[in-house]
A protein has these predicted regions:
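Solenoid-like repeat scaffolds
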Residues: 374-379
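Short, compositionally biased P/S/T/A/G/V-rich stretches that sit at domain boundaries
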Residues: 17-25
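Hydrophobic, small-residue-rich alpha-helical packing segments that form membrane-like cores
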Residues: 319-320, 327
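Acidic, glycine-anchored loop motifs typical of Ca2+
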Residues: 198-209
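Acidic, Ser/Thr-rich low-complexity linear motifs
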Residues: 331-342, 383-391, 435-444, 493
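Aromatic (Trp/Tyr) and acidic
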Residues: 24-101, 107, 122-178, 183, ...
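Bacterial Sec-dependent N-terminal signal peptides
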Residues: 1-17
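Carboxylate/His-rich catalytic cores and anion/metal-binding grooves
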Residues: 209-234
């Protein structure tokens, strides 16, 4: 009888338990502060905001029941608004015996976070890796589809490993480089100088974000060795040969382990060295983003006349290549049908043309940018879609509309603003159908969509001066930092003592248990995607099992590359958002 009562009471407690979800990094003093609570039974007790130092209640937040859908096995959701509290300190939410984790309210809560994101970027470096202090992939690579004979050596060492694997893609590296440069241009006083150009400790008089962006620019210059050539990918999925350290790469492309890797030249035509062929119609997606990066590099390195001139010339020639071969080039695969399926390019050429006009004053670039903007409008954006293939609508933030905005008349400005706002409203409509008010579809790399949506909201505010979507922006940021069903940040090591991805899908963790902070993991995916991917096998019982539902899953597990693999471009693509809140 006692055992029966114990089980009954335990079951009741678990049913009645209230879970709190907050931004673990914390809340800035003057911003809206809205947490989520959920339970399997109605919340009948009051909720208190408690000062963590004194354990005294400072506010009884009004409890607002959320009726716009539930999430998984929990039926009752509530919003807890404590925006009126602005006193700096550490706090927690409490209802009965249930408490949230402690979180701060303050002024400089995001200081240091960009440094962590840049540290993750440094550990993704190829050629020389300062995190590991090793040299790797010095034999990149042997040419394919180039103007020379196949398997001719071309020096394309450097750049970044793309994710947990060790491939290098111009698709993602061009965006990461340009995003960092644009972020610095918008927030020039927000970045520290703690490392040198090689990523080793010690200031060198250059903000670390520019050191990292130049690492990207140097590689972009290598893969555009002459006006008619552009290398778009180094290695392929033959890299996926188990966990390995970058300086001891056992993948074999036909020349032995730890040796040469293929360097694919962009031709604007389908490619593939196996049975899986990519789709391609041109090279404009790559050329446009590279042109934007080079033009920004030429402006930001004015003090280095030789380097600035190289960037300026490269911007012009690669942009011309994009006009000569209009269309898109996708990634290549050999072993499996998984690749970057990008098939948009008007947005990239718009951005490249707009930056070239800013650099040169040549009106032909402005005319091009306006033409591409009208063609891109919202057609190139995931924000007005419910589903799409992996990376088909890349990049996930169209900087082109923002850059062009200051260069055109008011009527054209209104068009550009409307393109951004149409996407924002579409995602907001989706957000209003779930209790966390998250606005993205849970496709592969949903976290990249989220950081990009935050970026679009920030740029819209800069374009228009309107803060009408500011609360929505905060909720997207907060999701990435813990205000989600699993209560976890989506960045490794952030915040330091919080719940964050630990068992990330990388060789560094698998072989060395090395936890490098700052990496944005892929994030939650639809169960329909997760269940149909090849090679996923959880290594441990699911710690978040209670919070999964039948539609969307996330696992902090080394074996889940679909949700817990950190990506280079997603991490770089978060810097705009993080800089905004510094």
């Amino acid at each position: 009888m006692r055992l029966f009562l114990f089980i009954l009471l335990t079951s009741f407690y678990l049913q009645a338990q209230t879970h709190f979800r907050i931004n673990q990094v914390g809340y800035l003093q003057n911003e809206n502060k809205v947490a989520v609570a959920f339970s399997k039974v109605p919340l009948t007790q009051k909720v208190y905001l408690v000062d963590a130092q004194t354990d005294k209640t400072v506010l009884t937040p009004k409890i607002k029941a959320v009726t716009n859908g539930n999430w998984g096995t929990f039926d009752y959701y509530y919003e807890l608004d404590f925006s009126k509290i602005q006193k700096i300190g550490n706090y927690y939410l409490k209802s009965g015996d249930d408490k949230s984790t402690i979180f701060p309210i303050g002024t400089k809560l995001y200081a240091g976070i960009p440094d962590l994101l840049l540290r993750f970027m440094r550990q993704q470096r190829c050629g020389y890796n300062p995190e590991l202090d090793v040299y790797c992939h010095q034999k990149d690579g042997y040419s394919f589809y180039g103007p020379m004979k196949d398997t001719t050596f071309v020096d394309v060492s450097g750049g970044w490993h793309d994710a947990g694997d060790q491939l290098k893609y111009l698709i993602t590296s061009s965006y990461a480089t340009a995003h960092m440069l644009k972020t610095y241009e918008l927030y020039p006083n927000k970045f520290e100088d703690k490392v040198d150009a090689l990523g080793k400790p010690g200031a060198n008089g250059i903000p670390d974000i520019l050191d990292e962006a130049k690492w990207g620019l140097d590689w972009l210059l290598k893969v555009h060795p002459d006006p008619k050539s552009l290398v778009h990918q180094i290695a392929d999925d033959r890299d996926h040969a188990g966990y390995k350290m970058p300086d001891n790469d056992n993948s074999d492309y036909g020349w032995g382990a730890n040796s040469y890797r293929p360097a694919y030249f962009a031709t604007g035509e389908p490619q593939g060295l196996g049975k899986f062929m990519s789709s391609a119609t041109g090279v404009s997606n790559l050329a446009g983003r590279c042109a934007a990066a080079f033009a920004l590099g030429a402006k930001l390195w004015k003090y280095d006349a030789e380097f600035a001139a190289r960037c300026a010339e490269a911007a012009k020639t690669v942009y011309a290549l994009g006009k000569e071969k209009p269309g898109y080039q996708q990634g290549n695969s050999v072993k499996a049908p998984y690749r970057y399926n990008e098939s948009t390019w008007y947005d990239d050429m718009e951005w490249g043309a707009a930056e070239l006009y800013r650099l040169t004053g040549d009106k032909s670039y402005l005319d091009d940018a306006k033409e591409f903007a009208l063609k891109s409008n919202t057609e190139d954006s995931w924000t007005v879609k419910d589903t799409t293939d992996h990376y088909r609508l890349y990049p996930f933030l169209n900087f082109g509309h923002f850059v062009l905005h200051e260069l055109v008349d008011k009527d054209f400005q209104k068009k550009l603003e409307s393109y951004y706002e149409e996407g924002i409203r579409y995602t907001l409509n989706r957000a209003n159908r779930n209790p966390f008010k998250v606005g993205v579809p849970f496709l592969w790399c949903s976290n990249n969509f989220l950081s990009s949506l935050a970026g679009q909201l920030i740029l819209f505010e800069k374009m228009t001066g309107s803060k009408k979507y500011n609360e929505y922006l905060l909720l997207q940021r907060d999701w990435l930092l813990g205000r989600n069903p699993w209560g976890t940040s989506m960045y490794s090591g952030i915040p330091e003592n919080g719940e964050f991805p630990r068992e990330v899908h990388t060789s560094l963790y698998a072989l060395k248990k090395l936890e490098v902070p700052g990496g944005l993991v892929d994030g939650p995916v639809y169960a329909s995607i997760y269940n149909n991917l090849i090679g996923i096998h959880l290594l441990h019982p699911d710690e978040f099992a209670e919070f999964q539902n039948n539609h969307v899953v996330y696992h902090d597990d080394l074996g889940d590359y679909s949700t817990n693999e950190p990506t280079m471009d997603g991490t770089a693509g978060s810097l705009l958002m993080m800089a905004h809140f510094l």
